[in-house]
A protein has these predicted regions:
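Glycine-rich phosphate-binding loops of nucleotide-dependent enzymes
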Residues: 2-266
Length: 266
């Protein structure tokens, strides 16, 4: 196993954030066109990816993180083509991801879940090896990550006994343990109260201030508009609008495609 460094988070100067390029990405599932000619660049800051259900947001995340291969197009991260790589290889390059459905290792403590993230690039089935690698280095690194994510008080608590707000923090802690330069967050505010969502938003801002680029999929428009520096809107697999939160909020295409659906569902 590669030696785990006590300093687990990357040191990135504001002048050199990682660059993600999505070039002409399309994805078809049989006759269904999930993504069509999507072009996207993200370099630093917090980017929000919003859109109605079925717009292709999670499909795009799955392609960036290696869980799906595109039908057409390429994904480039800091000059390296990554769209043909496996998920653990993409983690090794510095891209980590959380999922909308929270899946901590329920029979393990918060600390053990965090340590599992430290081994993710090398051992995809790390949970079976956690006890073996409870070393001073991993314990020190997990302490730092739990302090950053405000989970120290629950270090020895089983993950499956945590409320949803703390489980979402734990998902981020596990992702941080891999030392990401780019963090993909899929619906991080889902199921949270307004106060819990604001606390989580503050954590995300802190991570970004430390040099981690972040892309957030979010259905909560208030959360996304208050958090993100730039918003990209997907509808029917295509980007229909992008810009600052204020620009997107007043874009008729967004109102018709996204807010209109919310009104119809109300």
């Amino acid at each position: 196993m590669a030696q785990v460094q006590a300093q687990s988070l990357p040191t990135i100067t504001p002048e050199s954030p990682p660059r993600l390029e999505v070039r002409r990405i399309s994805k078809r599932f049989g006759g269904l066109q999930a993504l069509k000619d999507v072009n996207l660049t993200h370099e630093g800051g917090i980017l929000g990816l919003i859109g109605p259900n079925g717009a292709g947001k999670t499909t795009l995340f799955n392609i960036i993180s290696g869980f799906l291969k595109p039908t057409e197009g390429v994904v480039i991260f800091d000059g390296q083509t990554i769209h043909k790589r496996r998920p653990h290889q993409i983690v090794e390059l510095g891209i980590a991801r959380t999922f909308q459905i929270v899946k901590p290792f329920g029979d393990m403590t918060v600390r053990e879940n965090t340590i599992s993230g430290l081994g993710m690039p090398i051992y995809p089935r790390w949970q079976a090896l956690v006890q073996r690698y409870r070393t001073p280095d991993t314990l020190h690194a997990s302490d730092a990550i739990m302090a950053l994510t405000d989970l120290t008080a629950w270090a020895e608590t089983r993950a499956d006994s945590l409320p949803i707000g703390l489980q979402r923090r734990l998902e981020i802690a596990r992702a941080l343990a891999t030392g990401p330069r780019l963090l993909l967050l899929d619906e991080p505010a889902a199921g949270l109260t307004a106060s819990e969502a604001e606390e989580l938003a503050q954590l995300i801002r802190t991570l970004n201030a430390q040099g981690i680029s972040i892309i957030v999929i979010e259905h909560n428009m208030t959360f996304a508009m208050g958090l993100c520096h730039r918003i990209v809107v997907l509808a029917q697999g295509e980007i229909i609008a992008q810009g600052s939160p204020d620009q997107v909020r007043h874009d008729e295409r967004v109102i018709n495609a996204y807010l209109g659906q919310e009104d119809a569902d109300a």
